Amino acid sequence: MARSIDPAPRAVRGFVPARTDEERFLMRHVEDLARAAEGRGIARYSGFLSDREQDLARAALNRADVPESDHHFEGGWPGAARKLLCLEPEGCYPASPLCCVKLTCRTLSGAALPGHKDYLGSLMGLELRREALGDIVLLADTPGTAYVFALETAGELICRELLQVGRTEVTTTLLSLDEVPEFPQAERKTQTATVSSLRLDAVLAAMLHCSRGQACEWIAAGRVEINHLPAESAHAPVYEGDVFTVRGKGRFGLTALPGKSKKDRSIIEFFQY
């Protein structure tokens, strides 16, 4: 694809402040954890946070003037999406509540294996709170095996109570983080397209190979999120690094905006999760 010589200036999406009572409560909770950690010199940990919740936590820590050296986010493996906030002041004794449960399917050869939604549904059926569960990792080279990152109390409950996922019987093994194997990084195929403008409807249409009108219908129906927040307008600008979720269609990451084509159309680079 032909490109212009001069790339477009790189713009980034700014922080979106808390919008709901739940988000404001989360920020206050993070500040309370930070004060307890600093005031008592002991480690404190949140539950698992989504990408959006991690952004809110960072804003709360910044507001509370917590040094970067006193906190980090940990999800159990390098590619984790859902992570704990770990507040560990200098000199404290770390006591992370993070663990991993290995689930192994007991099924006949050739039988259908559970997918991610099946595992999550069965885990939520144990009446676990979502913040007690991190990533669920399925590996292509070991079909029938899943690794569930969880808080220790949730991991112990999973080992006691989870007997099957869907119609498939499973065995459970509680692992320390040191026992978790190294997962291969997912290979994601980057795609390139050109759009008439860097508006949400145009970019979604290119990613999903549909018309802009169809993209607008999905946005109006509340099926589209940008960075885990509901998309409010088809005309919303998009930025490098944005993540788009379209219910029923998938999730897409906008990795780069290299500039303009010779036909003066904006070039986008993206991948599907």
Can you describe what each PLM-predicted range is?
Residues 1-201, 207, 230, 244, ...:
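Ferredoxin-like alpha/beta domains used as RNA- or RNAP-binding modules
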Residues 197-248:
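Basic (Lys/Arg-enriched) interaction patch that binds polyanionic ligands
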